[in-house]
């Protein structure tokens, strides 16, 4: 008689130091031996059921006594219960299910095994062994969980599957035990991977949390196809989810920095300054961090208190930058009329005198503070507007008369100090320094600027006419200033009131980068340390010579290309033949007489 094999699960095979084991297909014997995975040294190693089973032939089984057969049945049950108690993803093979239910040997029309079919009249080598008694028909193993608890999305084209048989539901690598579909059939329908991770956005998580709060965690997990552990975790971080963007999927990043103690002490410093009402800047936080690091003997190469560190530290402690809302300049109601009038006056002068590009300029005075007050402060996220104190020296300033030409050149800065005399000291070259009691531009200083700066500009020729654009400040349009400009063969153009932000080149392209550069140099000077302190504990203001050097560096950093683009943007140096560049010109309506803003002196015929 031909030998028959019956599986007996005695132990699990352990594979050492193998990350992958190639699974071979069985050609003979029971085909329902399903693939399992066991854990060996932290890695998942696949094995076959027949590799952990023992086989008996009919002759060998008949030799055994009833006590031996009962012993093997008990060993089988103990081994299987042990595997389930260890929570191994071990499915109950179809063979064991049929043995426990005391199924008859298949002699019906057709019996389908995995990959083998026995027809009605075909003799089968397989029959139910004697050791599978009816007492094993009732199983006490845990029932499998439904698909929803695993977050599976079954394709719609697969027909409805029958109910689960007893056994642990292991679907990742071997298919679905108890189903008519084999593992290969299931693998061809959808792709499963044990290492697959799914991510959910904050909007979805909030929806699950709200459903869980109205019902319970289990119902929410089943309803949305997620794990119950995820529901518990999401309920713990509900405030963060509500404050986050709806499409945010993760809250990654270290919760503590490399130097957690430094971060903690800087955060305490920020709270202390907030309680006093003093403004806190990121530069001040960096300076404080360097001071703390020096006290803790942290090497400078290991901790530099960079701007990136400051941003990450603020993110860890829920701090943000609060910006001062600037007051916008309200444009005049008759904006269009003033723009057209100004453009027509400039075009009339240019067509009358045909200025060289290097002879068209723009000049204006601007205040530059010695101690630039910060427009931002560090505060808690979501706080209402707050009031902060200032050092009290933001009004200590100087006045700088700046000038630029349409070809991109910059005129020497004309500095006006506040006081009755120029203090002694070493000042940078390339600038003119004057003083005034209040630090303002006056009529006399304006005439002095025309003599020492405008008349001495590079390329100025006595008989070559020029054009200078100024704002409506009262000292610009006095009779003495107009007379001096006429003697210099220069036409004056006054920008209409309220439109300097749109028509003055210095406002458009110069002032912002200039002030930003001065602020950056002042911040670097603060971070350098070794500051002299006042009796109240505040840092003293920088020396005058150093501050003037910062202004000179910032002035030299303004590129010529940006100045040229600024003149074109304000439609001062636009090509007269290119009508597309003349924004406000009205064809055939050029005024025969200059408008009031220009004055009759500004259109005098050239020699």
From Swiss-Prot:
Chief localization: nucleus
A UniProt-annotated Pfam family: HTH_Tnp_Tc5
Ranges in coiled-coil conformation: 8-29
Composition skew (Basic and acidic residues), residue ranges: 589-599
The UniProt record lists the keyword Coiled coil: yes
Entry-linked InterPro entries: aKRAB, Brinker_DNA-bd, CenT-Element_Derived, DDE_SF_endonuclease_dom, Homeodomain-like_sf, HTH_CenpB_DNA-bd_dom, KRAB, KRAB_dom_sf
Annotated spans, Disordered: 588-607
Cysteine pairings via disulfide bonds: none
Domain KRAB: 47-118
Cross-link Glycyl lysine isopeptide (Lys-Gly) (interchain with G-Cter in SUMO2) residue location(s): 13, 384
Ranges for domain HTH CENPB-type: 250-323
Subcellular location: Nucleus
Ranges for domain DDE-1: 355-567
Keywords: Coiled coil, Developmental protein, DNA-binding, Isopeptide bond, Nucleus, Ubl conjugation
Molecular function as annotated in GO: DNA binding
One cellular-component annotation, GO: nucleoplasm
Cited PROSITE patterns: HTH_CENPB, KRAB
Biological process terms in GO annotation: regulation of DNA-templated transcription
Superkingdom in the source lineage: Eukaryota
Protein known as: Pogo transposable element with KRAB domain
Gene behind this protein: Pogk
């Amino acid at each position: 008689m031909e030998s028959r094999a019956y599986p007996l699960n005695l132990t699990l095979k352990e594979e050492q130091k193998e990350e992958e084991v190639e699974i071979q297909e069985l050609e003979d014997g029971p085909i329902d031996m399903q693939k399992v995975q066991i854990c060996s040294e932290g890695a998942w190693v696949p094995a076959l059921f027949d590799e952990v089973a023992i086989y008996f032939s009919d002759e060998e089984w008949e030799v055994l006594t009833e006590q031996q057969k009962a012993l093997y049945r008990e060993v089988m049950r103990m081994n299987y219960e042990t595997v389930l108690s260890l929570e191994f993803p071990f499915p109950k093979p179809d063979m064991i299910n049929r043995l426990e239910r005391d199924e008859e040997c298949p002699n019906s029309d057709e019996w389908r095994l995995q990959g083998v079919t026995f027809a009605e009249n075909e003799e089968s080598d397989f029959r139910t062994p004697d050791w599978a008694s009816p007492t094993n028909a009732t199983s006490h193993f845990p029932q499998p969980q439904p698909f929803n608890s695993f977050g599976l999305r079954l394709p719609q084209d697969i027909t409805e599957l029958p109910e689960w048989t007893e056994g642990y539901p292991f679907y990742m690598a071997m298919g679905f035990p108890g189903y008519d579909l084999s593992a290969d059939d299931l693998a061809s329908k959808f792709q499963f991977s044990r290492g697959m991770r799914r991510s959910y956005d904050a909007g979805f998580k909030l929806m699950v949390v709200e459903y869980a709060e109205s019902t319970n965690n289990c119902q929410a997990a089943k309803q949305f196809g997620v794990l119950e552990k995820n529901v518990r975790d999401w309920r713990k971080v509900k405030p963060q989810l509500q404050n986050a963007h709806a499409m945010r999927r993760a809250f990654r990043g270290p919760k503590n920095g490399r130097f957690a103690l430094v971060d903690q002490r800087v955060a305490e410093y920020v709270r202390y300054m907030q309680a006093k009402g003093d403004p806190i800047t990121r530069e001040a936080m960096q300076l404080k961090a360097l001071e703390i690091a020096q006290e803790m003997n942290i090497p400078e190469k290991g901790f530099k208190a960079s701007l990136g560190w400051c941003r990450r530290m603020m993110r860890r402690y829920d701090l943000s930058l609060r910006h001062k809302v600037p007051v916008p300049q309200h444009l005049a109601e008759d904006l269009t009329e003033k723009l057209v009038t100004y453009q027509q006056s400039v075009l009339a002068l240019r067509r009358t005198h045909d200025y060289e590009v290097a002879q068209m300029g723009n000049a204006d005075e601007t205040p530059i503070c010695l101690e630039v007050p910060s427009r931002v402060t560090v505060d808690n996220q979501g706080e209402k507007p707050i009031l902060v104190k200032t050092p009290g020296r933001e009004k200590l300033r100087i006045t700088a008369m700046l000038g630029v030409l349409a070809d991109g050149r910059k005129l020497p800065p004309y500095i006006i100090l506040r006081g009755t005399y120029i203090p002694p000291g070493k000042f940078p070259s390339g600038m003119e320094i004057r003083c005034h009691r209040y630090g303002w531009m006056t009529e006399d200083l304006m005439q002095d600027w025309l003599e020492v700066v405008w008349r001495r500009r590079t390329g100025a020729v006595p008989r070559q006419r020029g054009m200078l654009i100024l704002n409506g400040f009262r000292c610009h349009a006095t009779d003495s200033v107009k007379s001096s400009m006429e003697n210099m063969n220069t036409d004056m153009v006054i920008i209409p009131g309220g439109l300097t932000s749109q028509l003055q080149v210095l406002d458009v392209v110069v002032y912002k980068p200039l002030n930003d550069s001065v602020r950056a140099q002042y911040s670097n000077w603060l971070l350098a340390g070794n500051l002299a302190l006042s009796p109240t504990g505040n840092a003293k203001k920088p020396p005058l010579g150093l501050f003037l050097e910062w202004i000179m560096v910032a002035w030299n950093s303004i590129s010529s290309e940006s100045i040229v683009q600024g003149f074109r943007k304000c439609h001062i140096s636009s090509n007269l033949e290119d009508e597309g560049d003349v924004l406000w010109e009205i064809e055939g309506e050029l005024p025969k007489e200059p408008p009031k803003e220009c004055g009759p002196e500004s259109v005098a015929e050239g020699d």
